[in-house]
Swiss-Prot record:
It catalyses: (R)-lactate + 2 Fe(III)-[cytochrome c] = 2 Fe(II)-[cytochrome c] + pyruvate + 2 H(+); (R)-2-hydroxyglutarate + pyruvate = (R)-lactate + 2-oxoglutarate. Present with 13000 molecules/cell in log phase SD medium. Its main location: cytoplasm. It is found in: Cytoplasm. GO terms for biological process: filamentous growth; lactate biosynthetic process. The lineage of its organism: Eukaryota, Fungi, Dikarya, Ascomycota, Saccharomycotina. This is D-2-hydroxyglutarate--pyruvate transhydrogenase DLD3. One of its GO terms (cellular component) is cytoplasm. It comes from Saccharomyces cerevisiae (strain ATCC 204508 / S288c).
Length: 496
């Protein structure tokens, strides 16, 4: 990897208390021979040279790195089934992997687990324009799903900054929330059916198109957000929304978070049915993004403590523009905003969204970042970011080099009470980690929040569920894992 993409420390070395499960078999030539008997050369990547497998072993945040020497890239559900049956019989540990854009270390190995990549399962299976039902392989890239549906006057009900890389099966397996949760809700409500390969190779094929089905337990819900710990999602059936005929956005500069909350209340009241996103960013987030984007002109003339991006989508452009123009005038007259800009065309719309979507990549561009994803009541939403920034400043860790922390950045989805806290760093150090944890989790627990709003648990938050979940809930989760995966071979050392 180049200097722009530094190599993370091996997870096994960074976390020496985590030990490889001695019950798991070490891959040998007999295993390779079996996989070569069922897969083509294009479906196997095997090398002793770490750099050749680096993109499969290292996570996007450059924080976790495994030691897998075998990447399997099957192109069918049947092949996934054969792989899982063999691995279960032989007790070979497996990590399912989509686009590897995960943010909690869930999609890369910890030790020498086999990586099962879904990238070759990338076909659209079916689309019904009447019901809006979209069926596809798990490895379809979200960007391609969006483009396919756009060409058929529909949209995928989820959008993420990582849409160019993340895969549909991956976002389902992690229950990603995204930028339009406020309008379209969660994947638990949008996914109609799944095709899943269990650890023993059995296939649950319920990739149906029914909006209603009240016959027994809704098993698909167990696999949405399970992070590949109890089954490998290979196919998805999901409800696509009709493509809006009118899209618009406004970008505001605001001086305090109390005003952000007041603006949200006003937006819900006055924009109501056309409101599709309400995002906020703090000063640190935008400062990082300005430095990262460099040549892209910033939409506002002045710097502010907070910024808000509001998106509207509807079926009548004239109606929507009138509502948004009136809203902009009213917020200006009432002094709720310090400065604002309304998109004039599609190019403006895309540019405004670039300032929000680029924040994670900008924060990660200095060398790495510590990332937290939390749910809180709206009145408490920004308080965790302020508390962490104060803590890092008091320790003298934030500033120009050689200080390790570049900035502490808070941003997120006001509409669903979700804040992302990114600590942009030049290097990962134990001093920073000790200042952040368990402080962040204890703070969230004290506010009755959730330590993971949408990014999941993975390796990063394993063992920390008690900050959000009760003992009985955790026990039930372990029972589910033990039932579906008694040998523990699927995505071990993570989740529960």
């Amino acid at each position: 990897m180049t200097a722009a993409h530094p190599v993370a420390q091996l997870t096994a070395e960074a976390y020496p208390k985590v030990k490889r499960n001695p019950n798991f078999k070490v891959l040998d030539s007999e295993d390779l021979a079996y996989f070569r008997s069922i897969l083509s050369n294009d479906e196997i990547l095997n090398s002793q040279a770490p750099e050749e497998l680096a993109s499969f072993n290292q996570d996007w945040m450059k924080k976790y790195r495994g030691q897998s020497n075998l990447i399997l890239l099957p192109n069918s559900t049947d092949k996934v089934s054969k792989i899982m049956k063999y691995c279960n019989d032989k007790k070979l540990a497996v990590v399912p992997q989509g686009g590897n854009t995960d943010l909690v270390g869930a999609s890369v190995p910890v030790f020498d687990e086999i990586v099962l990549s879904l990238r070759n399962m990338n076909k659209v299976r079916d689309f019904d324009p009447v019901s809006g039902t979209f069926k596809c392989d798990a490895g379809v890239v979200m960007r391609d799903a969006h483009q396919f549906l756009h060409d058929h006057d529909h949209i995928f009900p989820l959008d993420l900054p990582s849409r160019n890389n993340c895969q549909v099966g991956g976002v389902v397996s992690t229950n990603a929330g995204g930028l339009n949760f406020l309008r379209y809700g969660s994947l638990h409500g949008n996914v109609l059916g799944l095709e899943v390969v269990l650890p023993n190779g059995e296939i649950i094929s319920n990739i149906n198109a029914l909006r209603k089905d009240n016959t027994g337990y809704d098993l698909k819900q167990l696999f949405i957000g399970a992070e590949g710990t109890i089954g490998v999602v290979t196919g998805v059936s999901i409800v696509a929304a009709a493509k809006p005929k009118a899209l618009n956005a406004v970008f505001f500069g605001i001086e305090n978070f109390d005003t952000v909350q007041k603006l949200f209340v006003k937006a819900k009241s006055e924009l109501s049915e056309i409101l599709s996103a309400f995002e906020f960013m703090d000063r640190g987030s935008i400062e990082c993004t300005i430095e990262y984007l460099k040549d892209l002109p910033f939409p506002l003339e002045n710097q502010h403590n907070f910024y808000v991006l509001i998106e509207t989508s509807g079926s009548n452009k004239r109606h929507d523009d009138e509502k948004l123009t009136a809203f902009l005038k009213d917020t200006t007259d009432s002094k709720l905003i310090s400065e604002g800009m309304m998109a004039k065309d599609k190019a403006d719309f895309d540019r405004l969204w670039t300032w929000r979507k680029s924040v994670p990549t900008a924060c990660n561009s200095y060398g790495g970042m510590y990332k937290y994803d939390m749910s809180l009541q709206l009145k408490d939403l920004y308080s965790v970011s302020a508390a962490v920034t104060e803590r890092l400043n008091a320790a003298g860790l934030i500033g120009d080099a050689p200080k390790p922390v570049v900035k502490s950045c808070g941003y997120g989805h006001v509409g669903d009470g979700n804040i992302h806290l990114n600590i942009a760093v030049r290097e990962f150090t134990k001093q920073i980690e000790d200042l952040l944890e368990p402080f962040v989790y204890e703070y969230i627990a004290s506010k009755k929040g959730s330590i993971s709003a949408e990014h999941g648990i993975g390796f990063h938050k394993k063992g920390k569920l008690h900050y959000t979940r009760s003992d009985i809930e955790i026990r039930f989760m372990k029972d589910i894992k033990n039932h579906y995966d008694p040998n523990g071979i699927l995505n071990p050392y993570k989740y529960i």
